[in-house]
């Protein structure tokens, strides 16, 4: 995993200092985009289940999974600056109903992220990977939750980043490497943490009405000012999905999401795979002016 960060950091630094044309920008003004508003629902209802049946469809427990997601961006394009503001939220619950027992409810997603990001539009690359822009960036964000989950305290983290980025390409929407400083207010006293982070986002039209989206990030923690059992050594998340247009801005498609984290204070790694089909809506409320 650590090699991923080293490779991404080297690639971004190379792009930033290579001999490319200076960027004058390809867009100007505000752009408001609802990237994704989606709902995933699956349900299994079993009546009179019994271990005497040989079919697993008649021995399983009734269950319902509901998950919603919002991804909104308000971006401003100037001649030498790209200012991005994002709101991301996801929340979901799983309802398990064993025969003859009380319903068990657990959360399968619970995250709210507000972030603002300022990037200097330093270079424009036109003949590599479909073209993109490159430059240094700095960002600050706040990560929390809709409610405290599973008996834990409500997560409250202020996170700042500074590094280099490739962005706004035909296919490569984002590739970055950054130094991270976190202020974690979840527990008292507050903990100041440092990390390296790398990530990317790719979007491409496979054919008319079918779009492929893939994104990922990897965060490698280095120091903590307060030692806690919940401290992470690293975390990584990745998602890939197909958006198949049904009608206007409404789409349906399969997706797979992977999340993995390693504990720093003890030798344990846990991961989560989530696959399914989602119904999603996306649109531009306002598009930036093309130059």
PLM segments and residue spans:
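Short loop/turn motifs that connect adjacent beta-strands in outer-membrane beta-barrel proteins
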Residues: 24-33, 75-84, 122-135, 167-175, ...
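Outer-membrane pore/translocation modules
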Residues: 95-199
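Transmembrane beta-strands of outer-membrane beta-barrel proteins
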Residues: 32-39, 83-87, 114, 130-140, ...
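Predominantly the C-terminal beta-signal and adjacent terminal strand-loop region
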Residues: 231-291
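Residues on the lipid-exposed face of transmembrane beta-strands in outer-membrane beta-barrel proteins
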Residues: 68-76, 114-120, 142, 160-168, ...
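Outer-membrane beta-barrel transmembrane domain signature
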Residues: 172-247
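Transmembrane beta-strands of outer-membrane beta-barrel pores
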Residues: 36-47, 78, 89-95, 140-146, ...
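Surface-exposed strand-loop-strand hairpins of Gram-negative outer-membrane beta-barrel proteins
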Residues: 42-67, 97-104
């Amino acid at each position: 995993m650590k090699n991923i960060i080293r490779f991404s950091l080297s690639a971004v630094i190379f792009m930033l200092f290579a001999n490319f044309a200076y960027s004058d920008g390809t867009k100007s003004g505000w752009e408001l985009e609802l990237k994704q508003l989606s709902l995933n629902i699956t349900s299994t209802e079993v009546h009179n289940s019994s271990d005497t049946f040989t079919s697993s469809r008649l021995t399983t427990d009734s269950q319902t999974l509901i998950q919603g997601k919002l991804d909104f961006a308000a971006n401003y394009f100037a001649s030498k600056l790209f200012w991005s503001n994002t709101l991301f939220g996801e929340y979901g619950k799983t309802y398990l109903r064993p025969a003859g027992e009380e319903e068990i409810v657990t959360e399968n997603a619970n995250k709210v992220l507000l972030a603002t990001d300022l990037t200097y539009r330093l270079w424009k690359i036109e003949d590599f990977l479909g073209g993109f822009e490159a430059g240094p960036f700095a960002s600050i964000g706040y990560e929390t939750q809709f409610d405290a989950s599973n008996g834990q305290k409500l997560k409250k983290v202020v996170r700042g980043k500074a590094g280099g980025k490739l962005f706004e390409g035909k296919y490569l929407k984002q590739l970055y490497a950054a130094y991270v400083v976190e202020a974690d207010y979840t527990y008292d006293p507050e903990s100041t943490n440092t990390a390296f982070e790398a990530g990317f986002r790719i979007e491409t039209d496979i054919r008319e009405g079918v779009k492929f989206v893939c994104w990922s990030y990897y965060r490698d923690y280095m120091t903590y000012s307060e030692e806690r059992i919940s401290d992470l050594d690293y975390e990584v998340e990745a998602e890939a999905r197909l958006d198949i247009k049904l009608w206007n801005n409404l789409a349906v498609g399969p997706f797979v999401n992977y999340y993995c984290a390693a504990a720093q204070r003890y030798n344990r790694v846990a991961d989560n795979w989530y696959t399914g089909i989602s119904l999603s809506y996306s649109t531009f409320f306002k598009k930036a002016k093309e130059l």
